[in-house]
Amino acid sequence: MKKIDYQKLLDNALKSVVKDALIHAQFNGLGDGAHFFITFKTRDPGVVLPDFLRIRYPDIMTIVLQYSYNNLNVSDKEFGVQLTFDGRPFFIRVPFSALIEFKDPSVDFMLSFQLKIAPSAGNDME
């Protein structure tokens, strides 16, 4: 008989908190100095990144949602957002299953999730 994976159940429940926070930001914006640091696995299925960012961040990347983001769109399984890199706008899509960490330093809030990746050479953990 298969055991209950409580860590997976907990991670899924906590990811719904992230989803709800992003939905709030999608419809209400980020007020009162709120800003999100979102760390995710760049090689997970469903992650959409420009090629130059995949090269720069082969395993893990952290994005910041604060002032310069547009078109935040949240669904049950993922979120997408337009961010500016090197002065140009790019669309990023991140499945919630790829999340490693979510922070809102304005209220000293942080969630961490199980990290299961095979490291590659030059892994840059920002």
Protein language model features and the residues they cover:
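Eukaryotic intrinsically disordered, low-complexity regulatory linkers and tails enriched in Ser/Thr/Pro
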Residues: 1-126
